[in-house]
Regions:
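P-loop (Walker A) phosphate-binding loop of NTP-binding proteins
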Residues: 53, 87, 158
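C-terminal engagement/docking regions of AAA+ P-loop ATPases
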Residues: 2-4, 11, 249-335
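Canonical AAA+ ATPase core
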Residues: 94-98, 123-127, 135-215, 221-229, ...
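Walker A/P-loop
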Residues: 42-80
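Walker B catalytic acidic pair
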Residues: 52, 118-119, 130
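AAA+ P-loop NTPase domains with strong preference for DNA replication initiators
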Residues: 198-289, 314
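Conserved alpha-helical scaffold flanking the Walker A/P-loop in AAA+ ATPase domains
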Residues: 37-40, 94-116
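Pre-Walker A (pre-P-loop) alpha-helix and adjacent loop at the N terminus of AAA/AAA+ ATPase modules
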Residues: 10-56
């Protein structure tokens, strides 16, 4: 039985989350829902897939997040000629003071707390798989030797939705490794005016660290452990499992789901659903998850995991309608 989380620990989590969100928001204008979703995924211990057109602030957002958390940051531009060694690192021959030569491992960009994998779908499947091992195992293997990655390790991969030529579709196994998928909307008129005003001056705003640099990594891991301690009752577990099941084309699913969906969300999707809900519970000041917490993260955690049929594409299907149908069915079954 997990002991109930104290009020002081919940307050500390909320204050830290709010401070980081506010600090990122000082530099990144707009995108408040996306910033909150990305922070939620970070404290849930997962990775995020970001979709947005070029120039909308993806790199600035991720770099500002790393700065606010006082964590190391690395950016890797994925291209068709990028090799796995360009991601993970490689061994090089080095000559010592005694004249002897030996192989030395030179870490790649993946050896950072926060990694921005820009336009990940431009790399070949072989290179994508190198990042997949890092995301799944928190380690990389080079020349038969395993190297652990820094902890926490947080990948934010971007997709450009308007340039599909020369890209490689992400396999379902890799999509399933992302806790959330977040879409960045185009800024409003007022937001665009603020962006232009704040970024064309001599001293544009910068992000100040919220966590102490010396203890930032251990502090982030401590807050992630706190999320795991949030209580989920059997009733809420059943509700979350029902939502996941109703995204698959089973007899219990909605007609729309059976027509559009080839494969529903995986059990890993259910794990992401509950972990995101646990963060939401803490942000609401509670040590336990409610169905409303689950509902709040259902779209971000499940929609990108669905494999749709050709009929869905012909109908111009939106996977978020499938999630809406699953949520409606789960609410009915709950009574």
């Amino acid at each position: 039985m997990t002991p109930e989380i104290g009020a002081a620990a919940i307050r500390d989590f909320r204050d830290t989350f709010a401070a980081v969100r506010s600090e990122v928001g000082r530099v990144v204008i707009g995108h408040e829902p996306a910033i909150e979703a990305i922070l939620t995924a970070f404290f849930a211990g997962g990775h995020v897939l970001i979709e947005g057109v070029p120039g909308i602030g993806k790199t600035l957002m991720v770099r500002s997040l790393a700065d606010a958390l006082s964590l190391s940051f690395s950016r890797l531009q994925f291209t068709v000629d990028l090799m796995p060694a360009d991601v993970t690192g490689t061994r090089v021959i080095e000559e010592g003071g005694d004249g002897r030569r030996s192989f030395v491992f030179v870490p790649g960009p993946v050896f950072a707390h926060v990694l921005l994998a820009d336009e990940i779908n431009r790399a070949t499947p072989k290179t994508q798989s190198a990042l997949l091992e890092a995301m799944a195992e928190q380690q990389v293997t080079v020349a038969g030797t395993t190297h652990p990655l820094p902890a926490p390790f947080f990948v934010l991969a971007t997709l450009n939705p308007i340039e599909m030529e020369g890209t490689y579709q992400l396999p379902e196994a890799q999509l399933d490794r992302f806790v959330f998928k977040v879409r960045l909307a185009y800024p409003s008129q007022a937001e665009l005016e603020r962006i232009l005003a704040s970024t064309t001056v001599a001293d544009p705003p910068t992000t100040a660290p919220v966590l102490e640099p010396a203890t930032a990594a251990s502090r982030a891991l401590e807050l992630r452990r706190l999320v795991r301690e949030v209580v989920v009752t059997p009733q809420v577990e059943r509700y979350a499992a029902t939502i996941v099941r109703l995204t698959a084309p089973t007899e219990a699913a909605d007609d729309l789901v059976r027509r559009w969906v080839a494969h529903g969300a995986s059990p890993r999707g259910g794990q992401a659903l509950l972990l995101g809900a646990k963060v939401r519970a803490l942000l609401d000041g509670r040590p336990h998850v409610t169905p409303d917490d689950v509902d709040a993260v259902a779209h971000a955690s499940l929609a990108h995991r669905l494999v749709l049929r050709f009929a869905a594409e012909a109908d111009g299907a939106d996977p978020h309608r499938v999630i809406d149908a699953a949520l409606a069915g789960a609410r009915r079954s709950r009574g």
